[in-house]
């Protein structure tokens, strides 16, 4: 990780230690410098994010790749974060970092499209290599997720806010994250994921759950029991009853296939 990225994070972490969302008063000076409006990103999301009957949103990467106008709009949106003050621990900055992460990820896929997975061409993935200017420094996707969002906010909601362009990732929403509705939107995202088979599948042996709950177990309480307790917070009554009947995690699962809208078209019969 570049030293400049770590220095930015170290300063932010010292000033704003990890805790829950919006548990510190917003600082007006920082708020005024943050891109408050995410209308351009919302327009792009509404245009290119496609809902499906299986509950997973897909992205029309081919359509976006073909539109120079919208690719330019995406670039312009991302550039707005270059010199913004994003250090304060506020809902507005959580939304800003999450939106930026998702926008940069979508741009990365579009620039390399067609691909079958975000990991194509990489040993483990592009997250340390894909960088963007934000908050006055160059930061990678890896730094945004692990050194900024997880470190400063320290809440499980981070994992429902960012999208890795993959089938098993929590959905990319069809609108930008906004401070005013952040809590309810993150709650809805968590419920949608946990109540979908890619989040939790109940078997006769126990629970098959997303690898997210393995990779980031510490963020969900630090043990399998705490992970199960987290799942029960969001599980619908029928699923919750099944989880309680056999609350043992027996398998982790993850599908890195690209969340590509083109796959939906192939499943439609003429």
Region locations from a protein language model:
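Positively charged n-region of N-terminal signal peptides that target proteins for export
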Residues: 1-4
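Bacterial N-terminal signal peptides
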Residues: 7-16
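Sec/Tat signal peptide C-region and signal peptidase I cleavage site
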Residues: 18-21
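Interaction/scaffold regions that mediate signaling and macromolecular assembly across diverse proteins
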Residues: 23-99, 103-270
